[in-house]
Amino acid sequence: RTLENSRMLSSDVSAGYDPLYASAFEKKNASYLGMGVVFNKFTGSRGKSGSNDANAEYMGFIRRVMESNNVTYQTAELGKVDLGGGGTIAYIMALYGMNVIDCGVAVLSMHAPWEVTSKADIYEAKRCYVAFLNADDETI
């Protein structure tokens, strides 16, 4: 019952749009450096297996928390279907009924020897986590 009545931000990074590898992304659904903390509503691969899909009510809660605290954020998908990646722990917590969504910063060249993130995104991620931890049902 405790987990069913809990909310979680699964802190993880998101692959930022890379114009050199544009074929790996859906440009209109990708995360971009310098555009704020990223929320990935759906994570996983191959459809529903080992995946998590945050419900609309939880997305609404997240948006209200971010907007009431002036946190810059973006929503994104992890990349084109079945190109690999996307495994997080969000689905494990969702199995117990917890409201969970992946949240973090966009990373260019993820898992390469040289990764790049935006300092502004890191700052917004910190602000996002503080706002989330201070949120409750009465203030939202």
Report each predicted region and the residues it spans.
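His/Asp/Glu-rich mid-to-C-terminal helical/loop segments that flank catalytic regions of hydrolases
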Residues: V105-I140
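A glycine-rich helix N-cap at a beta->alpha junction
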Residues: R1-L9
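Active-site-adjacent substrate-binding region
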Residues: S14, D18-Y21, F25-W114, D136
